[in-house]
Every structure is written in C-alpha cells, then in structure tokens.
A protein has these predicted regions:
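One-carbon transfer enzymes
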Residues: 1-235
C-alpha cells in the first residue's frame, strides 16, 4: 500500500520502520517543524531515501503525493486537514493512546494517570475534522496501576502496542475487512494539553470559540531517559 506518514520522535520512527519493512511504499512523511536536533523519524526516512514532503505545521493537500492511498498519523499532534484525507483512497487513520472516546486530546496518557484510571489502552480510529472523534477500527485494553505508575511507564507499555496496532490496521484496510464503529458520545471526554499549543487546522475555516482551557503544568520529568512525548529536552 502507498502510505504517507505524519508523525515524530521514537513512535513515528517505529511506525515508519515497521511499515517500510513490511513492504509498503512510503510516499512521504511530515514531521513537526525541525529545530537544532533532527527528529528520529526524519533520520530514518533520510537513511531509506524517503522524502520529507513538508512539516506537519504547513501540511496541505497539495503536498500529499499523487497516488497515496492512506495517511497514517503516528504521534503527530497536528490536525490533518480533510482535504489531505480526501485525497487518499482509504482516507487516514491514527493511533490514540487511550480507549476512545475517553481522553480525547493531546495528553491522553497524562490524563489517564491524573484521573486514576485503572484501565487504559490504544485505539486506531479514522481521521476527520473532529479531534480524535472518528470511527473506531481497532482497540486494545490494558490494566494499569494509576497509583504506582507515572505517565512514562504507561507510555512504555502502550508504545509497542501502538506500533503493532498500526501494522494490523493497515493489513485490515488493505484486505477490505474493515468494520468501523462509531464512538459513543455519551462517554466522551476531552482534556486540554498540559504543555502543548492548541491544535492548528490547515485548510479549514474555524468558526466558534476555543475548545481548550488552561491547565496547570506538570513538572518536567528529570529522570526519564526515553525519547517520549513528555520531556521538553527530547523535543
């Protein structure tokens, strides 16, 4: 399958590597805007001769290569426009580190721990105009210790699960065996990010007010050696 990946860091790299090694044609990638330190996903793409088409912040449908069949969002933290999604035969999918519709938003792992959930997991869902609100293709559940774990420990558990789920989802889509399930809005929650800016929507006229409120910031982790989604020094 011809796949375009929007992602970043270790998770984006792991998803890119898995799909590339499974024989899929990667038509391009879109990482976040690059700073002094090169993103790990970008480094792997350059090693394999995969084109960095645009950064996520400026991605529009014109930048999606012709013939792309599927967009995969792998820890991108950017809204992908509906025009980009519509350009692809199978649209787009994303991995979210919670059991949607619970904990929509950019900091699902942190909020899972903060709210003392005993159950978490991962979701593969259809990308669309609603943040983390698309139909569900796959879900995996895990039990957690909300009083003994921190967000890093939960993410370390969900990381490999997420990579496996993306791989499985692509195979399901390729085989035409998709069964999509709508999210039950009765149980939906949306929490704001602790540290990240509000989502930017390219190619979309935004009407109405903001959906995010201010939240107090967690202290930066000083012990974590993992290239995770929480440590500013690894961004």
């Amino acid at each position: 399958m011809k796949i375009f990946i929007c992602g970043q860091k270790s998770f984006g790299k792991a998803v890119l590597k898995r799909l590339y090694e499974e024989g899929h044609e990667i038509t391009g990638i879109a990482p976040p805007p690059q700073n002094i330190k090169k993103d790990k996903m970008v480094g792997y793409a350059e090693l394999k001769g995969i084109k960095v088409v645009s950064d996520c912040d400026n991605l529009i449908s014109d930048y999606i290569p012709e013939g792309t069949e599927l967009i995969v969002s792998a820890h991108s933290h950017w809204m992908i426009s509906q025009k980009c999604i519509d350009k692809c035969k199978y649209g787009g999918i994303g991995f979210h580190p919670s059991l949607l519709p619970r904990h929509r938003g950019q900091d699902a792992v942190r909020w899972t721990i903060k709210m003392r959930d005993f159950v978490s997991g991962g979701t593969i869902y259809k990308l669309g105009e609603k943040c983390d609100g698309g139909d569900i293709l796959l879900q995996r559940m895990v039990f957690i210790d909300p009083y003994g774990w921190d967000c890093h420990e939960l993410w370390r558990m969900l990381f490999p699960i997420g990579v496996d789920m993306v791989s499985e989802a692509v195979k399901v889509i390729q085989n035409g065996a998709c069964v999509w399930e709508k999210q039950d809005e009765r149980f939906a929650t949306f929490e704001p990010s602790f540290v990240r800016p509000r989502l930017k929507r390219n190619e979309l006229l935004m009407l109405g007010g903001d959906v995010e409120d201010e939240a107090e910031m967690y202290e930066n982790c000083k012990k974590c050696k993992m290239d995770c989604m929480f440590c500013d020094k690894y961004k």
